[in-house]
Amino acid sequence: MDHVKLVNDPIDIAHIHQLLADEGCGASSVFVGTTRDNFQGKKVLSLAYEAYDSMALKEMNKICSDLRSKWLDLKHIVIYHRLGTVPVCEASVVIAASSPHRSEALESVSFAIDQLKTRVPIWKKEIYEGDNDGEWKENKESIRPKKSKSGFNYAACPCKVEESHDVPRTLVQIRVNDAELTKRLECFVNRKRDEINSQNVIDFKSSFVSSDKDLSDSCARTQSTIIKQEQSNCHLKVRRVNNRCGPQQMEMRPNYELELNKLMGSRDGQTDPIKEMRKSLPNSRLQAIESYMGLTTDNEENIFSRIKRVENRLLQLESISPEYRHFTKREPSSMEAAPPKKIRKKSYSAQELSAFIQKIKDGSEFS
């Protein structure tokens, strides 16, 4: 049976012997680790142990499983470790095992203590005389990445780097020392902070405050109010710019397109571009398109406005039904070869084939 435990009280060795007792075992091996009173000429008063309890118990159980896989005759295994302050001469760890023969017990205990020092997350702190802080110690058996023996020796590198470079003053934009540069950065940050604060006051603070109150220490965090703007879901002010001239004023100027066409099309100021356009462009083609699109035809209307109406109608139809443009089949040109027609062959059943063969036989015999 496995007995694994982390204790805060002194470990009872007699209780350990009771856990190992078994009628079929002829040997019991017990290792007891205690606190010594010196280390490298320093007087040790006590040891302080800390552990990651759940992980430590898990690893200790794994050690027991490893012991039983290597030594199959082990009967009982005990691993007790003490936490907290452990004075001199008191036991901090006890590892014991019982088996029918002494070799398995001795070898398993030696293997277990090495694995405990290597794998279990328990940390030790030595308290010295005259030093209340103490010093954390590392087990020499703990697994740590070894330093590479083939490390690069930078001291033997023949490369030399020139540290002094003369930079032309024309390439230096800021010619101040570190203190002045730090001062400028702080001033810039403070100014930006003040701008943000002032904007927050404008956007968040209520303007309906009595003038007799001192507002020097007020802020948006303590006096914030949300003023809903008209026709808006946001409390911030939204402004719309109305241009006094340009395409946005076409509704206010009915003759804007006509004036623009005259301005862009007239050369000598005497010819009418609309009449010239009517003469050059066959009006019948546009009328056919308008009738196909279901639009009313007005020959007196500007040609560009009529084309624009057709384009808007196409966009409307495609937005309502995106597959609209796929419904119109383009007629093939006379130059293009007509695609071959697919002829579906008739499939015959077995009875029809038998009857057909029989007719052929009857005809041959008849002939």
UniProtKB/Swiss-Prot annotation:
GO cellular component, one term: molybdopterin synthase complex
EC number: 2.8.1.12
Keyword Zinc: no
Single GO MF descriptor: molybdopterin synthase activity
Amino-acid positions noted as binding substrate in the UniProt annotation, renumbered to this chain: H101, R102, K117, K124, K125, E126
Metabolic or biological pathway, per its Swiss-Prot or TrEMBL entry: Cofactor biosynthesis; molybdopterin biosynthesis
CDD domains linked: MoaE
Subcellular locations according to the entry: Cytoplasm
A single GO BP: Mo-molybdopterin cofactor biosynthetic process
Assembly behavior: Heterotetramer; composed of 2 small (Mocs2A) and 2 large (Mocs2B) subunits.
Miscellaneous comment: This protein is produced by a bicistronic gene which also produces the small subunit (Mocs2A).
HAMAP family in the cross-refs: MOC2B
PANTHER family attached to this UniProt entry: MOLYBDOPTERIN SYNTHASE RELATED (PTHR23404)
The protein's name in its UniProt record: Molybdopterin synthase catalytic subunit
Species in which this protein is naturally found: Drosophila simulans
Lineage summary: Eukaryota, Metazoa, Ecdysozoa, Arthropoda, Hexapoda
Gene that this sequence comes from: Mocs2B
